[in-house]
Amino acid sequence: MSFTPGKQSSSRASSGNRSGNGILKWADQSDQSRNVQTRGRRAQPKQTATSQQPSGGNVVPYYSWFSGITQFQKGKEFEFAEGQGVPIAPGVPATEAKGYWYRHNRRSFKTADGNQRQLLPRWYFYYLGTGPHAKDQYGTDIDGVFWVASNQADVNTPADILDRDPSSDEAIPTRFPPGTVLPQGYYIEGSGRSAPNSRSTSRASSRASSAGSRSRANSGNRTPTSGVTPDMADQIASLVLAKLGKDATKPQQVTKQTAKEIRQKILNKPRQKRSPNKQCTVQQCFGKRGPNQNFGGGEMLKLGTSDPQFPILAELAPTAGAFFFGSRLELAKVQNLSGNLDEPQKDVYELRYNGAIRFDSTLSGFETIMKVLNENLNAYQQQDGMMNMSPKPQRQRGQKNGQGENDNISVAAPKSRVQQNKSRELTAEDISLLKKMDEPYTEDTSEI
């Protein structure tokens, strides 16, 4: 007598639609209206349009009785301990609990940023003697197949289990006996979260409800999910990650401490590997402008490669091959001026080069390039000329325009000649007054 998962052994599979206890229809194994041709064991697989996987991925023409287990961490092996790994199915005795997990390589899709993302594989369980490897013996070394069986099962004979017809039988949420250790980096579809290494049956079944239902696995009726695609969760996760990645590239506020760290990091690099920016200016990286370093002026000296005009100039920069093979090179030993005298001296060499970059008016952005070059070539000469010009005479505090020549005249009128701080010769009248001040004072007693 053949057994039907999800039903008691005394009952036979019906040809009509059903919604039994603990049964859930999954979107990756949606039912299609079709005629039932056979109900016997090892029936010919029935392919449907939903079993075809576009955009890559292998075809799964067989419908598993259970929901899949999806990988969410790369590099994790799918494996169970001996005697574990067979899902619980009402109506299936322990002697028939034997089969294999089949790896389904899913398709890739385009993310929000335009890149192709390969979905991690999903594993489905098939009873021994059914599914894509129905003719293979238990334990055969097959890539993408992991064999499992209970301790009571005889793996030398196929399981007496019917194939699932999605038009009448719905997929069962995957549950395991207590003590089953799930593979690391995998989660059970429909559980709503990644599965830890050890999970009891009650906890696994409590998270096997559909997205729109709060009922538990022991409820009488469960509403089938609808409007859900098998890879919707992965697509949503990828979109969220892409969004986070985009937001993460937004410019962050740079503090004095971080600016100092960035500057020091740039200066620790060899001179020919430095890229000046806002935190480490051109002068800090390469020194002041002069005859030997004659490019840069104005904002470009402050912003360096962060200047909006710099990218168009970078198009003119030679490649490494053009630098070495298209230039005149000369190796010269120079004096080491760095380090203390008590430190061991190092031999310092300069690879001097002389070359040219040729371009014409047909170059894209030619006018802009010429404008930027004219503004920055030998710009230090104009800056030095402006600094060497005689500064405009500044008027003193409290001095009005037009009174610059009268340096000794105060704006406010002095109260006395002493405040003017000016010297002059004594007149005869002054001498007469001084003599009278020296004479003794006598009271005038004459009558008027």
UniProtKB/Swiss-Prot annotation:
Keyword Ribonucleoprotein included in the entry's annotation: yes
Modified residues (Phosphoserine): 167, 191, 390, 423
Phosphothreonine found at: 174, 427
Cellular location(s): Virion; Host endoplasmic reticulum-Golgi intermediate compartment; Host Golgi apparatus
SUPFAM superfamilies on file: Coronavirus RNA-binding domain (SSF110304), Nucleocapsid protein dimerization domain (SSF103068)
Post-translational modification: ADP-ribosylated. The ADP-ribosylation is retained in the virion during infection. Phosphorylated on serine and threonine residues.
Domain spans labelled CoV N NTD: 61-190
Ranges where the record places region RNA-binding: 52-194
GO MF assignments: RNA binding
Domain CoV N CTD: 259-384
A GO cellular component entry from the record: host cell endoplasmic reticulum-Golgi intermediate compartment
Compositionally biased region (Polar residues): 29-38, 45-55, 399-409
Keywords: ADP-ribosylation, Host Golgi apparatus, Phosphoprotein, Ribonucleoprotein, RNA-binding, Transcription, Transcription regulation, Viral nucleoprotein, Virion
A Pfam short name: CoV_nucleocap
Binding-site residues, RNA: 106, 122, 164
Region called Disordered, residue ranges: 1-55, 157-231, 266-297, 385-448
Biased composition (Basic and acidic residues): 422-439
HAMAP family in the record: BETA_CORONA_NCAP
Family as reported in the entry's similarity comment: Belongs to the betacoronavirus nucleocapsid protein family.
Protein name per the record: Nucleoprotein
Gene (UniProt): N
